[in-house]
């Protein structure tokens, strides 16, 4: 992850990246550290990292490790993160208009 994501972001001129953790069943100390390193690397490349779907146990693991994610935007769900970035879910709008 740490090797490919930053390279792809630069290649594709990505300015913001949502890292959604809602489908990740277990986050141990190594994964939490990798996420932190990824966010710092992206910052240095000018890519804004946004986190969504962080569960309480993931937050606790990060705090226990002394990892400070407070400088990053975090959202409870991917939908909230995307809406805040101005991305609207067209599928839901189509269903609502039926």
From Swiss-Prot:
Example GO CC term: the record gives: cytoplasm
Subcellular localization is given as: Cytoplasm
Q: What InterPro entries does the annotation carry?
A: Bact_StressResp_Reg, STAS_dom, STAS_dom_sf
- Which PROSITE patterns does the annotation name? STAS (PS50801)
Q: Mainly localized where?
A: cytoplasm
- Identify the residues that the record assigns to the STAS domain, covering every copy: 1-85
Post-translational modifications reported in the UniProt record: Phosphorylated on threonine residue(s). Phosphorylated by PrkC and dephosphorylated by PrpC.
SUPFAM superfamilies, per the entry: SpoIIaa-like
Q: What keywords are annotated for this sequence in UniProt?
A: Cytoplasm, Phosphoprotein
* Keyword match Cytoplasm: yes
PANTHER family per UniProt? RSBT ANTAGONIST PROTEIN RSBS-RELATED (PTHR33745), RSBT CO-ANTAGONIST PROTEIN RSBRC (PTHR33745:SF3)
Q: What is the recorded name of this protein?
A: Uncharacterized protein YezB
From which organism does this entry originate?
Answer: Bacillus subtilis (strain 168)
